[in-house]
Amino acid sequence: MITFQDTYDSRKKEIENFLELMKFLEKKENEREDGKSKFSEFFYPETGGIHLTYQSLINILKSNVSLMIYNIIEYTVTNLIDSIYDEIRVNHLSYIDVNDSIRNLWRKTILRSVNEPNANFSTFLRKNEEIISAILSNNELNMYAKNTLPGGNLDGTSIKETFESHGIQVRTSSRNYRPDILIGIKENRNNLAHGSVSFVEAMREDSIDDIRANESLVVGFLEELIETVSTYIEDQKYKKV
């Protein structure tokens, strides 16, 4: 069985390999012979073939690696949150068994449909009855990250708020916690996903070294999150004290 950690390590390695490829291409572009780069021998031959400039290819690759970084952020956060919910299910915990933060989040998740355009007072009453019934019946809580996470919108602030809503404190004093970098990665992902910017243009201003430095900080932040949530689960902090 492939575990979360196996998949996380694999995706981290994919990003590192992608960055190595870009550094290799950068090296070939800077190697000159008779005024021509080694890169052009492969991607812009005089005899025909693939006509692709170095800068266009690198910009496309930079956009792709930015998406890969966002994906590992979303994958990690989603799986860490679901690992908490798995513990709640495995231990057959009900509303009265979990901590106050999770209780509050569970109620908010059920009441979320009240804010939908077609919702009315009857919707509000029905959802309140659902909450009351579940509490009185001592039903096991069934929660899933797909219902509690802000889809496609994970940045430093939303990640911090997500974990705090479960009673987990993110290490905001850590050098790896960089909301400015995380929001840039999120915005770039959304712009590419919605087609408002091309892959050639999206990361034009960022160097390969910039992206590599940002990736290192993001990975450091994610690994701190993994450690924090692992301790939270081991200490059963999801339970009511």
What are these regions (language model features)?
Residues 1-4, 8-11, 50, 95, ...:
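Intrinsic-disorder-associated interaction segments
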